[in-house]
C-alpha cells in the first residue's frame, strides 16, 4: 500500500515486523510496540533508526516526517533517567 510502511521494531525482547500508516505519529508507534512487547508503562521509550541510534524521533511527528522506508529497522530503546536506576548490587 502506498500509504503504509513496513518496519522492523527491534527491542531487547526481540523484533516486531509490523505495518503502520505513514501518517502514524511516533508516540503511537511506541505505544503499539509497548503493548506488543508488554513493556512496563513506567519505562520511558524512544524510537530511532538503527543506523542513527543517537537521533531519537520526536514523538509528536509522524513516519512521513522522517521518510521512513519499507523494510526499515527501527530501534525501540529504554531511556535511563539519572537517579531512576539505582545500583543495588552490593
What are these regions (language model features)?
Residues 1-90:
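Ubiquitin system architectures
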Amino acid at each position: 500500500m502506498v500509504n503504509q510502511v513496513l518496519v522492523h521494531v527491534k527491542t531487547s525482547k526481540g523484533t516486531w515486523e509490523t505495518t503502520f500508516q505513514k501518517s502514524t505519529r511516533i508516540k503511537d508507534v511506541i505505544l503499539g510496540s509497548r503493548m506488543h512487547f508488554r513493556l512496563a508503562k513506567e519505562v520511558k521509550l524512544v524510537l530511532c533508526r538503527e543506523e542513527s541510534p543517537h537521533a531519537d524521533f520526536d514523538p509528536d511527528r509522524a513516519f512521513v516526517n522522517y521518510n521512513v522506508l519499507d523494510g526499515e529497522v527501527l530501534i525501540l530503546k529504554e531511556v535511563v533517567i539519572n537517579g531512576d536506576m539505582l545500583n543495588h548490587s552490593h
